[in-house]
Amino acid sequence: YDKRHLFRMGNEHERFSMGKSRVVMDYKGWKIMPLICYDLRFPVWSKNKFQFNKYEYDLLIYVANWPSVRSDVWKSLLIARSIENLAYVAGVNRVGIDGNGVEHTGDSGIYEPSGKPLFLLPPDEEIMATQLLSYEALQQWREKLNAGLDWDDFTIDY
């Protein structure tokens, strides 16, 4: 996956070129879409698709470098992406102080399609954890609230 939205405040646009395609991987029957950091702020880029009574993906994974001063935004957007896409969302964020003295508290977690936190890691801890996701619970939620049937169909030209 190539990161679509380059973080101008970090001068990424001077060192990298933006990606032009999305990737959805299949792992043990789960459709997974990886995204990077700043892409979280752009809901159109991560918009789940619903065609032929199937969703494009089941899990969004954001690997990120969000500083602690924006941790509330980070968490709010993860919740929003889970609700609007009827998918699990995992946010994996860095911990510690970077080379510029910017603090990162992590605030990593997994959110259910309802937006409810399923698993939250404690802030400021370098930790590795696993969480079992229920495909059955995901399908039940989608059947209960199948908003995909009413989503607008649109395309993005690059």
Question: What are these language model-derived features?
Answer:
Residues 41-128:
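CN hydrolase (nitrilase-like) catalytic-core segments centered on the catalytic cysteine
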